[in-house]
UniProtKB/Swiss-Prot annotation:
The keyword Ribosomal protein does not apply. Could be involved in insertion of integral membrane proteins into the membrane. It comes from Chlamydia muridarum (strain MoPn / Nigg). This is Putative membrane protein insertion efficiency factor. It comes from the Bacteria. It holds the Pfam family YidD.
Length: 97
C-alpha cells in the first residue's frame, strides 16, 4: 500500500516535534503509547481521515481532566507497541528488567 504524501508530511511533522519541542517540555505523556507514537501508528494503520479523527480525539484527552493510561489505536495490540523502537514510554507494569 502506497503512503500518500500528506501522510508522509504529517509523519515528518510528528518526528520534528519529537526531536525539537518534546525534549523541552520535559514531562512524560500521561498515556501509553505516547501521543506522538499513537499518531504515527494511526497514520500507518488507518486511512488519512480516520487517522486525523483518532489523533484529534486523543489530543483532546491530553490534559488534567483525563486520567490517562493505556489507550491503543483501534485495531492494534499492546505487543505491537512493546516491539516498537520508536517509543520509550512503556507503562510501569509492562517494563522488562
Amino acid at each position: 500500500m502506497k503512503t500518500s504524501w500528506i501522510k508522509i508530511f504529517f509523519q515528518g511533522m510528528i518526528h520534528l516535534y519529537r526531536w525539537t519541542i518534546s525534549p523541552l517540555l520535559g514531562s512524560p505523556c500521561r498515556f501509553f503509547p505516547s501521543c506522538s507514537e499513537y499518531a504515527l501508528v494511526a497514520l500507518k494503520k488507518h486511512p488519512l481521515k480516520r487517522s486525523l479523527f483518532l489523533i484529534a480525539n486523543r489530543l483532546l484527552k491530553c490534559g488534567p481532566w483525563h486520567i490517562g493510561g493505556i489507550d491503543l489505536v483501534p485495531g492494534t495490540s499492546i505487543e505491537e507497541y512493546l516491539e516498537s523502537p520508536d517509543d520509550k514510554n512503556v507503562p510501569p507494569d509492562q517494563e522488562t528488567v
